[in-house]
Amino acid sequence: MNRPPEEYVHVTEDKLLAFAVACFESAGLDHEHAHTIGRLLVNSDMRGVRTHGTRAVNRYCRAFEEGNTNPQPDVRQIHEAPTGVVIDGDGTLGYLPMVRATEAAIDRASKLGL
């Protein structure tokens, strides 16, 4: 039977976020990019979805360090329409492009009165 551990190490949200951001910065990400990914991973942990949380930090940092994923992407809009955008993530993980796309969608929706 799969049982959770009986003893835990408790880490505050702020310390976990600071650790994740520091790991990503040491792998070559700028602060905004590191904080964006770190915040989203910590949010997953805080919701109890640990499969999509900070357990991925090591794997993601390795991908950045080994050149499999772009740590300094030029994330940009390559197409726009009144209700949507297409974002080029330039070979990075989807977190930063997704946040930028969401921000653009919110902006467009507000301009349309939604």
Question: Which residues make up each language-model segment?
Answer:
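Generic N-terminal amphipathic, Lys/Arg-enriched alpha-helix
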Residues: 1-27
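Conserved catalytic cysteine-centered active-site region
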Residues: 104-114
